[in-house]
Amino acid sequence: MKDIHIYAFADEASPMVDGQIEAMVRNGMQGLEIRNVDGENILDISLQKAREVRKKLDDRGLKVWALGSPIGKTGIEEDNFPKVLSSIMNAVELAHILGAENIRMFSFYIPAGQDPARYQSQVIDRLSRMAEAAEGSGVTLCHENEKGIYGDNAARCEEILRKVGALQGVFDPANFVQCGQDTWEAWKLLGSKIKYMHIKDALFKDNSVVPAGKGDGQVDKILKAFLENGGECLTVEPHLTVFDALKTLEREGEKSRVGGAYAYPSSDAAFDAACQALRELLG
């Protein structure tokens, strides 16, 4: 088995990069999947700010593994695709400064109540053009399964990764649970296309997020298969308590189920608990 590299969405510990660094260091993380910095979304920071963040991370021996971008978390019917392509190029430039190998992205929200199949060709066309925009940059676009987007279940994720060959996959067990998808069946279909995993778990009964290994995501079984298949990189995504940027991750009208069965006195405590849950799964 190869060495395991563990990263985190440390904005769930602190909105400030200094607090994120301390959270990663005390939990033995290698670095960040960077999503929000000092109250700003990663795509909104200046290039100079990115250089400053890179220096702070370098000084503590930490790296940025991926940009946890929101690209593709817009409606498929929105007339904003030129802006999406511009965001890809901006993300690539930030990734180069920060030293990130990957950009996490999504496959567009489908209108509520509509059959996703109606939008199949439009989604694939957009994702293909996004992949073309990043071609030759040295940065990989990684599609994450997410509630409400075209790629919310295993079958459509497989279709995306098969038809847009330049993309690789991010496997999020909790998001599959929240879509009613059996995660092991999803893994069997997608495993060969997965570049890294988000360590996050949830319950079928109420969609609430729980520590990894405590839910219905079969995280232990899938993690074992991922590592045996040559996988190396994991991102801890706690979602165990409300944090500053949570509302920016949700579709309008939706609310994440966090902080239910498991309660923590602070965002730092919830972050530490999520890291500990992964350590227990890894043995």
What residues fall within each predicted segment?
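Short, well-structured secondary-structure segments
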Residues: 30-36, 63-66, 103-105
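Active-site beta-loop-alpha junctions enriched in small/polar residues
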Residues: 9-13, 35-37, 69-72, 108-110, ...
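Histidine-acidic metal/acid-base catalytic patches
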Residues: 1-28, 54, 58-61, 153-168, ...
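Glycine-rich, proline-tolerant flexible connector loops at the mouths of alpha/beta enzymes
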Residues: 33-57, 107-114, 207
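A short acidic, helix-capping loop that chelates divalent metal ions and anchors anionic groups
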Residues: 38-41, 73-78, 111-116, 178-179, ...
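Active-site acidic/histidine proton-transfer and metal-coordination neighborhood
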Residues: 16-22, 56-59, 76-169, 178-180, ...
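A generic secondary-structure micro-motif detector
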Residues: 10, 42-43, 81, 120, ...
